[in-house]
Swiss-Prot record:
SUPFAM superfamilies: Cupredoxins (SSF49503), Cytochrome c oxidase subunit II-like, transmembrane region (SSF81464)
Annotated organism of origin: Gadus morhua (Atlantic cod)
Cofactor(s) the protein requires to work: Cu cation
Transmembrane parts of this sequence: 15-45, 60-87
Keyword tags: Copper, Electron transport, Magnesium, Membrane, Metal-binding, Mitochondrion, Mitochondrion inner membrane, Respiratory chain, Translocase, Transmembrane, Transmembrane helix, Transport
Biological function: Component of the cytochrome c oxidase, the last enzyme in the mitochondrial electron transport chain which drives oxidative phosphorylation. The respiratory chain contains 3 multisubunit complexes succinate dehydrogenase (complex II, CII), ubiquinol-cytochrome c oxidoreductase (cytochrome b-c1 complex, complex III, CIII) and cytochrome c oxidase (complex IV, CIV), that cooperate to transfer electrons derived from NADH and succinate to molecular oxygen, creating an electrochemical gradient over the inner membrane that drives transmembrane transport and the ATP synthase.
GO BP: ATP synthesis coupled electron transport
Protein name (record): Cytochrome c oxidase subunit 2
PROSITE patterns hit by this protein: COX2, COX2_CUA, COX2_TM
UniProt-annotated binding residues for Mg(2+): 198
UniProt enzyme class: translocase
Amino acid sequence: MAHPSQLGFQDAASPVMEELLHFHDHALMIVFLISTLVLYIIVAMVSTKLTNKYILDSQEIEIIWTVLPAVILILIALPSLRILYLMDEINDPHLTIKAMGHQWYWSYEYTDYEDLGFDSYMIPTQDLAPGQFRLLEADHRMVVPVESPIRILISAEDVLHSWAVPALGIKMDAVPGRLNQTAFITSRPGVFYGQCSEICGANHSFMPIVVEAVPLEHFESWSSLMLEDA
């Protein structure tokens, strides 16, 4: 869960998000070293009265500032490509959920069940219970079993939306007429919040996403109750 004045990412709740955090730290270290080196060179050039007679024509310097940036880009690109392939992998999902974006709410359908689906609307501020979060709570949460591979199919009924949950490392466009898919595994129980991340009209800010990860036996009890109420 994000908090005021937060400078970093939310705590990772999926293996993909953990990889993204590691990659962020890796890239940030490289950027810090480059910035330090450039700042040192600028200060050294400005503060000295000496002049290097080879500064305008030096094959060694030409080779260094050609090869070194290429090596740095490779060190950034290889981990990035690994994570991209990891995010695209969908292996034997235990559960498939279809999320549809509407103006301005989400609807969910558990396709492995015959009649398990619901609409998810934001809870108005005046109806919030103590301890609930303004603009982030939904009347129906998307409940998933913890530590289980989940495939989610994402589309939209009207305009372009985007289904995003930062703690899970997920952001996928919901495009009318097109079915996108991604997968995730929740690494711990909890409630994870997200929002529509594509401007989609007047009430774009009022499309929260709430994913609740629970133990498998709790999920089975929840799904049974939902099917009875259907």
